[in-house]
Amino acid sequence: MAGPQQQPPYLHLAELTASQFLEIWKHFDADGNGYIEGKELENFFQELEKARKGSGMMSKSDNFGEKMKEFMQKYDKNSDGKIEMAELAQILPTEENFLLCFRQHVGSSAEFMEAWRKYDTDRSGYIEANELKGFLSDLLKKANRPYDEPKLQEYTQTILRMFDLNGDGKLGLSEMSRLLPVQENFLLKFQGMKLTSEEFNAIFTFYDKDGSGYIDENELDALLKDLYEKNKKEMNIQQLTTYRKSVMSLAEAGKLYRKDLEIVLCSEPPM
């Protein structure tokens, strides 16, 4: 964590590499919660103004609040009062804007789940470094972006450092889903409703009436509704349709197996 006197790195540069962007992010997201907010946000805005003007320390002028408000209206796309990583990528001149490149490839939660299914080749519930590298390679090809092996390696390591919250060198589904725009990230809706393995097994067994080891989309509908009602949360038909479509992207021929649903609903991916 950066000390209060440490100068923010790289804000003055005309273009940032992926690694430099990450250093800026880690400097200002001091508590590591995935957002720049509150005092962190004020500090970021002041330092950004200072870097852009090339002036001395900025004093808090009368119009600081108004300038901050305009800044947030421009860049806080989902109006939650916080800056997330992809919003920061819009503010700073990031080289080849690799985060936006991701989002063009997995623009919806259903596409994201399909990509997850493709690259979680061993069905472990994680994408490991070698699998992530393949994911990024395909991504860059789709976007017609030239790259060499060192650049691909840099992107792989940078994405790991960005999203690998527990530092184990691999990305779980909830970590990887932070690549999605917040409004598309249906997995965020399940935060606070994560099940233990015992709870998950009980609810899956209840809906898998014939003990086949999988459920279909109608049974998934009922399961999701049940989960929301038990947690006293509301879900409309449109949300239910979106969540079902996203989760069913993990299914095989309309069959959603226990292990795949467990990745979405459990606190920890299956062992």
From Swiss-Prot:
Binding positions (Ca(2+) 5): D208, D210, S212, Y214, E219
SMART domains assigned: EFh (SM00054)
Binding sites annotated in the UniProt record for Ca(2+) 1: D29, D31, N33, Y35, E40
Binding site for Ca(2+) 2: D76, N78, D80, K82, E87
GO molecular function: calcium ion binding; calcium ion binding involved in regulation of presynaptic cytosolic calcium ion concentration
A Pfam family reported for this protein in Swiss-Prot or TrEMBL: EF-hand_1
Record-annotated disulphide pairs: none
Major localisation: other
Record-linked SUPFAM superfamilies: EF-hand (SSF47473)
Any Gene Ontology biological process: synaptic signaling
Post-translational modification Phosphotyrosine, affected residues: Y214
Keywords: Calcium, Cell projection, Metal-binding, Phosphoprotein, Repeat, Synapse
Record family assignment: Belongs to the calbindin family.
Protein's recorded name: Calretinin
Annotated organism of origin: Rattus norvegicus
